[in-house]
UniProtKB/Swiss-Prot annotation:
It is found in: Cytoplasm. It catalyses: adenosine(37) in tRNA1(Val) + S-adenosyl-L-methionine = N(6)-methyladenosine(37) in tRNA1(Val) + S-adenosyl-L-homocysteine + H(+). GO terms for cellular component: cytoplasm. This is tRNA1(Val) (adenine(37)-N6)-methyltransferase. InterPro entries: DNA_methylase_N6_adenine_CS, SAM-dependent_MTases_sf, Small_mtfrase_dom, tRNA_Adenine-N(6)_MTase, tRNA_adenine-N6_MeTrfase. The keyword Transferase applies. It is an enzyme of class 2 (transferase). One of its GO terms (biological process) is methylation.
Length: 240
């Protein structure tokens, strides 16, 4: 019964739906935040690394009507879920799904933008289900290795957008700076006004750039904050 529920579980957004299949990463606020926040300009080519269900690819396709998107995942179950969701979407012709390991994948071109919600659990615990272990732990995609791939995948003036928990995000940024990358847009996310920052949204560049720091509070006393509603209203059904 659990397997059937997982296979049939779906999440509806305003312009598309996501079916999770047996993918290791369910729909999360992290993914919606990143897909809504990434890229202040309109990139023409986007690489979605570790695409999971294809959520970020579909969000980018909706936001950027002229973008062509490549969605990549090492897990076959994730690739199959992303491919199914691509085919069911209004933008199937602008999204290409590939089953490949980003550390060994050799694209024919570089990308104007990269989007990635990386795995981050470094606790050493191993999830019982191998698909979830691959998705949630830095087993198959170490942050250092991912950072080292960025200059090979990005165009010279390209940008890579990420979301991570605060501690892991700070470590990731430190590694990126050591590798000669530069932080541009940077947003600290708080769940509520009285709770500390728990997520970082940030963008990395290959060339020096002016850092732009902001803060986002998800919920206030009366419900979702106006800033969160404005950011996500094109996607969530109940956001007007």
């Amino acid at each position: 019964m659990k397997t059937n529920k997982l296979i049939n579980k779906s999440f509806r957004f305003k312009q598309f739906s996501i079916e999770e299949g047996t993918c290791g990463m369910p729909i999360s606020t992290d993914g919606v935040l990143l897909g809504s926040w990434a890229f202040s300009l309109s990139p023409t080519t986007i690489l979605d690394i570790g695409c999971g269900t294809g959520l970020l690819s579909l969000m980018c396709a909706q936001r950027f009507p002229h973008a062509h998107i490549t969605a990549l995942d090492i897990e076959q179950t994730a690739y199959l879920a992303a491919e199914h969701n691509r085919q069911q979407s209004p933008w199937a012709e602008r999204i290409e799904c590939q089953h490949a390991d980003i550390l060994h994948w050799q694209p024919s071109k570089r990308f104007a933008a990269i989007i990635c919600n990386p795995p981050y659990f470094n606790s050493g615990e191993t999830a019982q289900h191998q698909v979830r272990a691959t998705a949630r732990h830095t087993i198959s995609l170490q942050h250092q290795a991912l950072i080292e791939r960025l200059p090979q995948l990005l165009e010279p003036d390209g940008v890579a957008s990420f979301i991570l928990p605060k501690a892991e995000g700070e470590d990731f940024i430190a590694l990126a700076r050591q590798a000669g990358l530069f932080v541009g847009r940077y947003c600290q996310v708080q769940p509520t006004t009285d709770k500390p920052v728990h997520r970082l949204l940030f963008e990395l560049h290959l060339s020096p750039c002016l850092p732009v720091e902001t803060r986002l509070v998800i919920r206030e006393q009366q419900g979702y904050s106006e800033a969160f509603c404005q950011l996500t209203r094109d996607f969530y059904l109940k956001m007007s």
